[in-house]
């Protein structure tokens, strides 16, 4: 059985984080908005390199994506802020390996903005609901301060030096326009809320004690249960303690309304100004401590549906699925690469959690959803799908590009877009005589294809021949994204056959030979997956794949040695493949990688030599001439687990060959 390479983050998962890429409390301040100000002249440079800074920023976004329970008064703005921050993920992935002083300075400043956004969003998740409703204007000022600072940092980014793709630059320009246009919004619900609060605090309005208004406010602010009111009391105490500048009138209004809500629940009104302030985290844990093993390592929340991944670690199913959907193929806790992305229910742990909760009378928290946000997204998608059939060229261009961005954003959008009937229309646009529409259509399909159901829908619509046509004749970025789309679709075995029969392999080999670095990587991953099909191995060999692969082995700077060796391993299982690669110079190259390559290089090269030698002992004899034996002995004790297995098998094969 031929071992194949572990496809990494440059594969299908990357479609979410790339358009054309291969490839987680602060006190609330009313007067002092400077808590989120980023003073450019005072930005301290961090010692991290650019790679580390990018990882930090991406980690912040991943953390923010897990935050639940935004206060209703700021919920929509919170979702908007997170969405805008996530737009930068593909750009960050694109510059991840770039190192320069100007890039480091830019990323340091960008991280400062993301940290400020994190503080604000945590406040909107944990802060006093009454205060945020009472002083919504100040909260909006803080959001707009973030927008202004983010725009300022992006405008001064060293784009020319970073050499990012034109499409990534267009997305950043579009984001900057959004940030500039962001207006302070007052929803109808907010107006009603403001009027109710004005009535409640009025000294002259006879309705100020009207229980119906109080009940309505309690419902809007979600302060209707005893637990809600206890949590709000702690939040207000912390606010008053931390915020020394909170004026007396504001304090009185907050406490007055809190006491009105308490009376509705039959609780005694108290003056919390004179009660000791208890830290919220301590309050939650003094009476009951959650067992560490019950908490998801990603969210640090109790697990409702624990599942086991390939490394044996357990996570909340929803959280780890989001991690995978974002294109990651590593364990979040151990950072190990995963052999597979299968999830196995941890029934034993789930039963333990349920028993513990029942025994301790622990109420499992419900996660909040945003139905308003979901409905808005559905409406937006419906309008975009309708616009795909417009007779106006510019409207078609705008809609397909916007859909492309939505499809990349999250798994939910991919399902929404497919359910709205977009896939047949997008497939039709692949043949549209406009290079921009073609490029955006094929990239949208690439992003949609991350979803397994969508893979089938796309191929059932007959998209593959049209994608191959763009691969042959489209512009540079369209060709690269077509290759990535073919890789994604080829995850289904029937599509491997269809792509091979549709003559999709020769243009992939051409892109591997003549494409840009990203184009080569897209082609390489697609060809690897297609070569898992026996008939496609022969097609790839006939298309001349061997020489481009050998060329990749000569240039370490391209960073594709392991991938090239992995495809050569597949080809070595084919008679024509062995004939094409079995040159003396290639055997010498393999031995050189076994001698002084990276651990993964050694693993892959040893695997290729074992496959060749298992079919023809002359390859073993040739390798011995280049001194391979002592290098294999070293690998048996110091190599990766797989490399050790392969080296031991190869040593046994050498012993048999010598006996013969």
UniProtKB/Swiss-Prot annotation:
Per the record, a Pfam family? U-box
In terms of SMART domains, this protein maps to:
ARM, Ubox
Which pathway or pathways does this protein act in? Answer: Protein modification; protein ubiquitination
Kindly state a single biological-process term from the GO annotations of this entry: protein ubiquitination
- Domain U-box stretches: 289-363
Sorted alphabetically, the keyword list is: Repeat, Transferase, Ubl conjugation pathway
Kind of enzyme, top EC level?
transferase
Task: Name the CDD domains on file.
Answer: RING-Ubox_PUB
SUPFAM superfamilies, A to Z: ARM repeat, RING/U-box
Positions of the UniProt region annotated as Disordered:
1-29
The EC number(s) this enzyme carries: 2.3.2.27
* Ranges for the ARM repeats: 411-450, 452-491, 493-532, 534-573, 575-614
Catalytic activity line of the entry: S-ubiquitinyl-[E2 ubiquitin-conjugating enzyme]-L-cysteine + [acceptor protein]-L-lysine = [E2 ubiquitin-conjugating enzyme]-L-cysteine + N(6)-ubiquitinyl-[acceptor protein]-L-lysine
Its job: Functions as an E3 ubiquitin ligase.
What the entry lists under PANTHER family is as follows: U BOX DOMAIN-CONTAINING (PTHR23315), U-BOX DOMAIN-CONTAINING PROTEIN 15 (PTHR23315:SF349)
Query: What is the name of this protein?
Result: U-box domain-containing protein 15
Gene of origin? Answer: PUB15
């Amino acid at each position: 059985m031929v071992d194949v390479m572990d496809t990494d983050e440059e594969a299908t998962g990357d479609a979410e984080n790339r358009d054309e890429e291969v490839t987680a409390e602060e006190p609330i301040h009313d007067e002092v908005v400077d808590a989120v100000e980023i003073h450019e002249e005072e930005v301290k440079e961090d010692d991290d390199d650019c790679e580390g800074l990018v990882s930090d920023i991406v980690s912040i976004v991943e953390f923010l994506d897990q935050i639940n329970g935004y206060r209703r008064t700021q919920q929509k703005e919170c979702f908007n802020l997170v969405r805008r921050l996530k737009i930068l993920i593909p750009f960050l992935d694109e510059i991840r390996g770039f190192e320069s002083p100007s890039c480091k300075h830019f990323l340091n400043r960008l991280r400062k903005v993301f940290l400020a956004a994190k503080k604000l969003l945590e406040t909107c998740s944990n802060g006093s609901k009454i205060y945020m409703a009472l002083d919504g204007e100040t909260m909006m000022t803080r959001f707009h301060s973030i927008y202004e600072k983010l725009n300022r940092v992006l405008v001064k980014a060293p784009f020319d030096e970073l050499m990012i793709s034109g499409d990534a630059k267009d997305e950043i320009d579009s984001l900057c326009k959004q940030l500039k246009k962001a207006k302070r919004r007052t929803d109808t619900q907010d107006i009603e809320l403001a009027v109710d609060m004005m009535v409640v605090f009025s000294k002259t309005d006879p309705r100020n004690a009207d229980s119906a208004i109080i009940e309505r406010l309690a419902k809007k602010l979600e302060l209707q249960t005893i637990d809600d009111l206890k949590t709000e009391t702690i939040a207000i105490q912390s606010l008053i303690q931390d915020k020394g500048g909170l004026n007396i009138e504001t304090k009185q209004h907050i406490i007055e309304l809190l006491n009105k809500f308490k009376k509705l629940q039959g609780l005694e009104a108290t003056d919390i100004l004179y009660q000791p302030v208890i830290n919220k985290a301590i309050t939650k844990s003094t009476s009951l401590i959650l067992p560490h093993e019950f908490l998801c390592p990603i969210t640090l929340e109790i697990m409702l549906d624990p599942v086991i991944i390939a490394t044996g670690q357990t996570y909340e199913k929803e959280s780890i699925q989001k991690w995978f959907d974002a294109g990651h193929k590593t364990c979040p806790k151990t950072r190990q690469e995963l052999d597979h992305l299968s999830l196995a229910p941890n029934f034993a742990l789930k039963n333990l959690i349920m028993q513990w909760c029942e025994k301790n009378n622990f109420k499992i928290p419900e996660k909040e959803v945003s139905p308003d946000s979901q409905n808005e997204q559905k409406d937006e998608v419906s309008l975009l799908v309708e616009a795909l059939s417009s007779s106006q060229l510019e409207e078609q261009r705008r809609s397909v590009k916007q859909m492309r961005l939505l499809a990349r954003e999250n798994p939910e959008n991919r399902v929404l877009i497919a359910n709205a009937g977009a896939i047949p229309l997008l497939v039709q646009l692949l043949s549209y005589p406009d290079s921009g529409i073609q490029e955006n259509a094929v990239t949208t399909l690439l992003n949609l294809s991350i979803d397994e159901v969508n893979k089938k829908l796309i191929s059932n619509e007959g998209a593959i021949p049209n994608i191959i046509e763009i691969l042959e004749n489209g512009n540079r970025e369209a060709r690269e994204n077509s290759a990535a789309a073919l890789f994604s679709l080829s995850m289904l075995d029937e599509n491997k056959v269809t792509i091979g029969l549709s003559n999709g392999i020769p243009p992939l080999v051409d892109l591997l030979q003549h494409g840009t670095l990203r184009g080569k990587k897209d082609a390489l991953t697609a060809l690897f997956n297609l070569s898992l099909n026996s008939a496609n191995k022969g097609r790839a060999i006939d298309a001349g794949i061997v020489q481009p692969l050998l060329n990749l082995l000569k240039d370490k700077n391209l960073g594709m040695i392991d991938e090239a060796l992995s495809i050569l391993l597949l080809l070595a299982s084919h008679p024509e493949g062995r004939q094409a690669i079995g040159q003396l110079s290639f055997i010498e190259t393999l031995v050189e990688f076994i001698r002084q390559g990276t651990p993964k290089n050694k693993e892959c090269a040893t695997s290729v030599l074992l496959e060749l030698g298992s079919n023809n002992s002359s390859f073993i004899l040739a390798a011995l001439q280049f001194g391979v034996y002592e290098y294999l002995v070293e690998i048996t004790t110091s190599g990766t687990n797989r490399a050790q297995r392969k080296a031991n098998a190869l040593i046994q094969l050498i012993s048999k060959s010598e006996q013969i």
